[in-house]
């Protein structure tokens, strides 16, 4: 629920950088209330307002959601869920600027429900795919920071909550190992 904290973190970066966002949603909707940053619009604000952002690389939304983004920018590179499943990402990799460090933000809703439970609609990315992509980034670029968000619904019955928390904990450990 607090993916917009990434904007707060990246606002502190005072050098050119790229932001890599793994998310089932674009987080680039028009703001519902002008001047208020939310989980639905924070990424659009980063690309428009942060003077140090070189690229925002968005990984995981459905193609139809990417097409609905109102913001057009040469700083935005997208990899749809469909491109990832088809392993058709190579055509865009030459657009990625490897000369600047990256900040990585992961919303666990990009992952399949069998791996992680969140309180939003979820994608179908496998943990191995996320680990592979993180490995490529971490091996090739300086990483300024990483954040992970996307928790399960705290209002669900306790047995389901405990099961989902266990899944999420396993996911965090796996992701942490990938970053090492």
Predicted feature locations:
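Conserved small/polar residues in nucleotide/adenosyl-binding loops
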Residues: 174-180
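Active-site histidine-anchored catalytic micro-motif
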Residues: 1-63
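Acidic carboxylate-rich catalytic motifs and surrounding loops in phosphoryl-/glycosyl-chemistry enzymes
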Residues: 57-65, 144-159
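Active-site rim beta-loop-alpha module in soluble metabolic enzymes
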Residues: 57-117
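Active-site flanking residues adjacent to catalytic metal/cofactor-binding acidic residues
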Residues: 22, 104-108, 179
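A short alpha/beta connector and helix-capping loop motif
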Residues: 18, 34-47, 113-153
């Amino acid at each position: 629920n607090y993916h917009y904290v990434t904007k707060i973190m990246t606002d502190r970066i005072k050098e050119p950088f790229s932001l890599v966002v793994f998310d089932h949603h674009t987080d680039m909707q028009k703001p519902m209330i002008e001047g208020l940053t939310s989980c639905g619009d924070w990424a659009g604000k980063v690309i428009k307002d942060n003077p140090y952002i070189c690229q925002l690389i968005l990984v995981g939304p459905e193609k139809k959601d990417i097409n609905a983004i109102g913001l057009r920018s040469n700083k935005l590179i997208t990899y749809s869920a469909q491109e990832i499943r088809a392993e058709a990402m190579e055509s865009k990799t030459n657009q990625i600027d490897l000369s600047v460090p990256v900040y990585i933000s992961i919303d666990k809703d990009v992952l399949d429900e069998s791996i992680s439970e969140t309180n939003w609609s979820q994608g179908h990315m496998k943990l191995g795919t996320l680990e592979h992509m993180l490995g490529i980034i971490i091996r090739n670029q300086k990483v300024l920071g990483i954040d992970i968000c996307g928790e399960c619904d705290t209002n669900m019955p306790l047995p389901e909550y405990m099961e989902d928390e266990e899944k999420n904990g396993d996911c965090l450990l796996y992701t942490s190992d990938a970053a090492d």
